Every structure is written in structure tokens, then in C-alpha cells.
Amino acid sequence: MLTLLRLDSSPLETSVSRALTDEFVAAWKAAHPDGVVIVRDLTLAPPPPVDAVWIGACFTPPPQRTAEQNDRLALSDAFLEELERADEYAIGVAMHNFSIPAVLKLWIDQVVRVGRTFAYSDGRPQGLLQGKKATILAATGGVYSAGTPAEGMNFLDPYLKTVLGFLGVRDIQVVTAGGTSQLRNPDVDREAFLEPVLQRVRETAA
């Protein structure tokens, strides 16, 4: 039985990135009717930033951790269980100031953990999330695709691909709805604007 982890990071319920993850999940469930979907909306309970206790706990063998250290890692452990359980990830992300939303960065800091999502072998890091698939479902107000003048300002999917690759995820797809600032124009039909992107989402999820 396949399992999909859906991550949402936009604070807006009507955001384009959520429309993309909605469409991905619907198409994925149609293709995998017996599959399980784990939903993690990071905006409902934003992860806290890591602190000295958290860092110390990560580098302390589990049997030697204090109650405070175990408590500090509890949320991270829950995130990691979802990552390890899932076969595929659907990551909904809107571009914020040329990169990812702060809440998604907080989640990343909680899940990049030595001994859980990566380890060192012969002095080199090795990702432990092998055999997983990820789809980055991005929404950007401007257009930052390859060959455009603003291409070099896109730190969203290059960063996420770097993080996922570091953790061992090699099968990564990116579907981007670019130029979404046009939707602020009342003369632009949202459904017609998004349909070509949603079609790519459906094809990717199937």
C-alpha cells in the first residue's frame, strides 16, 4: 500500500499552491485508490526554531537523553515518522521573497537530522530517505522559469531540490504556477489561468 505525505506551507486557504496540492492528491488517490494520504499543514501549528537543547539532543545517544531532550525532539520525531512512512511527498510551496515560506524552513530544520535522515560514511554525508519520490508544487507571483530575466532570483525549487537530494531523495519533479500575480486582475479567470498547470499536476501524480 503506497503512502503519500502532503505538505502545505501557505497561510492562505485559497492560495494557488494549495490548489495544486489539492489537485495532486485527487489525481494520486484516483491512481492509487488503496493508498494512504498523510496531511501535514505546517501553518496550523508552525514548528519552533531549533535551539541549544534540540541540537544537544540530536548529538546525544537516545538512551542517554534527558527528559527535556526527548520532549524537545518529540515534534521532530513525529515529522520524521511521516517522512519515513511515506513513499511519496507532495510539497505545496509559494514563493516568499524569492525563496520558501519561513514555516517550511522551520520544518526542514526539524527533519534534517544526523542518524535519521542522513548519516556519514567515510566522512561523507549519505541520505537515508532512499527510494522516495517528491513533487514540488510551487506558486510564484512572477515568472522565474529557465531562460527568463528573473531566473537567477529563484531560490525556491533549487533549494528544495538540494535539501531533498541531501536526504537521499533522487526522484524529484517540479510543477510551477508562474505569474500568479495576474490573478489579482479581476479580468483574469482563475480557472482558465490555472488549468494548464493543473493538467501537468494530474499527469505528474498519475
Curated annotation (Swiss-Prot):
This protein's UniProt keywords: Flavoprotein, FMN, NAD, Oxidoreductase
Reaction catalyzed: 2 a quinone + NADH + H(+) = 2 a 1,4-benzosemiquinone + NAD(+); N,N-dimethyl-1,4-phenylenediamine + anthranilate + 2 NAD(+) = 2-(4-dimethylaminophenyl)diazenylbenzoate + 2 NADH + 2 H(+)
Top EC class for this record: oxidoreductase
Coiled coil regions, renumbered to chain: none
GO MF annotation, one: electron transfer activity
SUPFAM superfamilies listed in its UniProt record: Flavoproteins
Cofactor note: Binds 1 FMN per subunit.
Claim: NAD is one of the keywords in the record: yes
Source organism superkingdom: Bacteria
Binding site residues for FMN: S10, S15, V16, S17
Cofactors, names only: FMN
EC number of this enzyme: 1.6.5.-, 1.7.1.17
PANTHER family assigned to the protein according to its UniProt record, in alphabetical order: FMN-DEPENDENT NADH-AZOREDUCTASE 1 (PTHR43741), FMN-DEPENDENT NADH:QUINONE OXIDOREDUCTASE (PTHR43741:SF2)
The protein's assembly and partners: Homodimer.
Sequence similarity: Belongs to the azoreductase type 1 family.
Its job: Quinone reductase that provides resistance to thiol-specific stress caused by electrophilic quinones. Also exhibits azoreductase activity. Catalyzes the reductive cleavage of the azo bond in aromatic azo compounds to the corresponding amines.
Protein name in UniProt: FMN-dependent NADH:quinone oxidoreductase
Gene, per the UniProt record: azoR
